[in-house]
C-alpha cells in the first residue's frame, strides 16, 4: 500500500466523541468483482462490491488506483475503507454552493449536494485520489464557516436478530 495515506484518521462527532481509525498497511481493499491474482488471500468481504486482502498491493499487477487503503476502528478493530468522499457541513445559513470556490482552492470539488440540506455537501479531491481527499480533510476543517468534515468510510454490515 502506498505510504501517502495518513497513519491515523480521527473523526469527531457533533457531541465531541472521537472515533479513531488506524491504517492497516498489511491490508488493502478492491472490487470483489475483479478476479483474484495468484497469492491474493481474501480476509473479509465487506459486501457484494468490496473485499479486503492480506497481500501487499505492490506485489500484485493491479494499478494503484484500483486499490484502497484499509483502516481499523480503534479499539474494536473493525475494518473501515475510505471511499475518497468527504462529508462537509457548513454553519447554519451557509449554502454549500457559496463555498464552492473556497473548496476548489484546496484541491477539492463539490461532488453531490443532497436535497435535504443546503449547508452540507459531499466533496472529493479534484485528483480523484483517496490519499488527497484524506489530506484535504484537515484543510477543509480549518476553512471559515466549516463546522464538520468526515471521511466516508465503508464498514462491514452488521446484522442483528429480530428476536
Tell what function each PLM region has:
Residues 1-163:
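Primarily auto-inhibitory N-terminal propeptides
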Amino acid at each position: 500500500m502506498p505510504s501517502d495515506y495518513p497513519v491515523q484518521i480521527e473523526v469527531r462527532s457533533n457531541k465531541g466523541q472521537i472515533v479513531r481509525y488506524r491504517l492497516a498497511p498489511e491490508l488493502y481493499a478492491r472490487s470483489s468483482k475483479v478476479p483474484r491474482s495468484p497469492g491474493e488471500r481474501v480476509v473479509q468481504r465487506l459486501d457484494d462490491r468490496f473485499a479486503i486482502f492480506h497481500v501487499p498491493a505492490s506485489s500484485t499487477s493491479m494499478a494503484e488506483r484500483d486499490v484502497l487503503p484499509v483502516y481499523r476502528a480503534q479499539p474494536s478493530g473493525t475494518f473501515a475503507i475510505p471511499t475518497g468522499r468527504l462529508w462537509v457541513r457548513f454553519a447554519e445559513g451557509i449554502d454549500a454552493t457559496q463555498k464552492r470556490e473556497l473548496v476548489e482552492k484546496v484541491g477539492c470539488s463539490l461532488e453531490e449536494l443532497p436535497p435535504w440540506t443546503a449547508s452540507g455537501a459531499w466533496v472529493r479531491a479534484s485528483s480523484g485520489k483517496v490519499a488527497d481527499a484524506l489530506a484535504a480533510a484537515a484543510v477543509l476543517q480549518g476553512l471559515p464557516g466549516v463546522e464538520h468534515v468526515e471521511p466516508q468510510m465503508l464498514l462491514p454490515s452488521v446484522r442483528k436478530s429480530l428476536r
